[in-house]
C-alpha cells in the first residue's frame, strides 16, 4: 500500500480533512453561564405543570414508599383495629389505681 504524500506547508495549513462538512467542523459557541433570573408569572405556571407530571405515577422505590405511607393510614388487616396508644394508657391507669 503506497504511503500518502504530505508536504509540510499543506499539512500545517489544513488541520481537518476535506470530507468534513462545515457544520461539523465549526466549533460550538462558548456557553455563557448566566445566573437564572427569577421566573415571571407565566413561567411559574409552566413550573407547576412540570411538577404535576412527576406526580403521575411512582416507579420503583418511590412506589414502595408511597404504598407504605398509605398502608399506615389504613386500618390493620382482617378487621383488627390499631391499639398502639390505648394499651399504654390503660396500663398507666391501672398502675395509678393500684398505687392508691
Swiss-Prot record:
<dbReference type="GO" id="GO:0010225">
    <property type="term" value="P:response to UV-C"/>
</dbReference>
<comment type="subunit">
    <text>Interacts with transcriptional regulator SEHBP.</text>
</comment>
<dbReference type="GO" id="GO:0006325">
    <property type="term" value="P:chromatin organization"/>
</dbReference>
<feature type="compositionally biased region" description="Basic and acidic residues">
    <location>
        <begin position="30"/>
        <end position="50"/>
    </location>
</feature>
<feature type="modified residue" description="Phosphoserine">
    <location>
        <position position="89"/>
    </location>
</feature>
<dbReference type="GO" id="GO:0031492">
    <property type="term" value="F:nucleosomal DNA binding"/>
</dbReference>
<feature type="modified residue" description="Phosphoserine">
    <location>
        <position position="99"/>
    </location>
</feature>
<dbReference type="GO" id="GO:0003682">
    <property type="term" value="F:chromatin binding"/>
</dbReference>
<feature type="modified residue" description="ADP-ribosylserine; alternate">
    <location>
        <position position="25"/>
    </location>
</feature>
<feature type="compositionally biased region" description="Basic and acidic residues">
    <location>
        <begin position="69"/>
        <end position="85"/>
    </location>
</feature>
<feature type="modified residue" description="N6-acetyllysine">
    <location>
        <position position="82"/>
    </location>
</feature>
<keyword id="KW-0963">Cytoplasm</keyword>
<dbReference type="GO" id="GO:0005654">
    <property type="term" value="C:nucleoplasm"/>
</dbReference>
<feature type="modified residue" description="Phosphoserine">
    <location>
        <position position="8"/>
    </location>
</feature>
<protein>
    <recommendedName>
        <fullName>Non-histone chromosomal protein HMG-14</fullName>
    </recommendedName>
</protein>
<keyword id="KW-0007">Acetylation</keyword>
<dbReference type="GO" id="GO:0005634">
    <property type="term" value="C:nucleus"/>
</dbReference>
<keyword id="KW-0013">ADP-ribosylation</keyword>
<keyword id="KW-0238">DNA-binding</keyword>
<keyword id="KW-0597">Phosphoprotein</keyword>
<dbReference type="Pfam" id="PF01101">
    <property type="entry name" value="HMG14_17"/>
</dbReference>
<dbReference type="GO" id="GO:0040034">
    <property type="term" value="P:regulation of development, heterochronic"/>
</dbReference>
<dbReference type="GO" id="GO:0048597">
    <property type="term" value="P:post-embryonic camera-type eye morphogenesis"/>
</dbReference>
<feature type="modified residue" description="N6-acetyllysine">
    <location>
        <position position="14"/>
    </location>
</feature>
<feature type="modified residue" description="N6-acetyllysine">
    <location>
        <position position="27"/>
    </location>
</feature>
<feature type="modified residue" description="Phosphoserine; alternate; by RPS6KA5">
    <location>
        <position position="25"/>
    </location>
</feature>
<comment type="similarity">
    <text>Belongs to the HMGN family.</text>
</comment>
<feature type="modified residue" description="Phosphoserine">
    <location>
        <position position="86"/>
    </location>
</feature>
<feature type="modified residue" description="Phosphoserine; by RPS6KA5">
    <location>
        <position position="21"/>
    </location>
</feature>
<dbReference type="GO" id="GO:0006283">
    <property type="term" value="P:transcription-coupled nucleotide-excision repair"/>
</dbReference>
<dbReference type="GO" id="GO:0050678">
    <property type="term" value="P:regulation of epithelial cell proliferation"/>
</dbReference>
<keyword id="KW-0539">Nucleus</keyword>
<comment type="function">
    <text>Binds to the inner side of the nucleosomal DNA thus altering the interaction between the DNA and the histone octamer. May be involved in the process which maintains transcribable genes in a unique chromatin conformation. Inhibits the phosphorylation of nucleosomal histones H3 and H2A by RPS6KA5/MSK1 and RPS6KA3/RSK2.</text>
</comment>
<feature type="region of interest" description="Disordered">
    <location>
        <begin position="1"/>
        <end position="100"/>
    </location>
</feature>
<dbReference type="GO" id="GO:0005737">
    <property type="term" value="C:cytoplasm"/>
</dbReference>
<dbReference type="GO" id="GO:0000720">
    <property type="term" value="P:pyrimidine dimer repair by nucleotide-excision repair"/>
</dbReference>
<dbReference type="GO" id="GO:0000785">
    <property type="term" value="C:chromatin"/>
</dbReference>
<dbReference type="GO" id="GO:0001674">
    <property type="term" value="C:female germ cell nucleus"/>
</dbReference>
<dbReference type="GO" id="GO:0010224">
    <property type="term" value="P:response to UV-B"/>
</dbReference>
<dbReference type="GO" id="GO:0032786">
    <property type="term" value="P:positive regulation of DNA-templated transcription, elongation"/>
</dbReference>
<feature type="modified residue" description="ADP-ribosylserine">
    <location>
        <position position="7"/>
    </location>
</feature>
<dbReference type="GO" id="GO:0006357">
    <property type="term" value="P:regulation of transcription by RNA polymerase II"/>
</dbReference>
Amino acid at each position: 500500500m503506497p504511503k500518502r504524500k504530505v508536504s509540510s506547508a499543506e499539512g500545517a495549513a489544513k488541520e481537518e480533512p476535506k470530507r468534513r462538512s462545515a457544520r461539523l467542523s465549526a466549533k460550538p459557541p462558548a456557553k455563557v453561564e448566566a445566573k437564572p433570573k427569577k421566573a415571571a408569572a407565566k413561567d411559574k405556571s409552566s413550573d407547576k405543570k412540570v411538577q404535576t407530571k412527576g406526580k403521575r405515577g411512582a416507579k420503583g422505590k418511590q412506589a414502595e414508599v408511597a404504598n407504605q405511607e398509605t398502608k399506615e393510614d389504613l386500618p390493620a388487616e382482617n378487621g383488627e383495629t390499631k391499639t398502639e396508644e390505648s394499651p399504654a394508657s390503660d396500663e398507666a391507669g391501672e398502675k395509678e389505681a393500684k398505687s392508691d
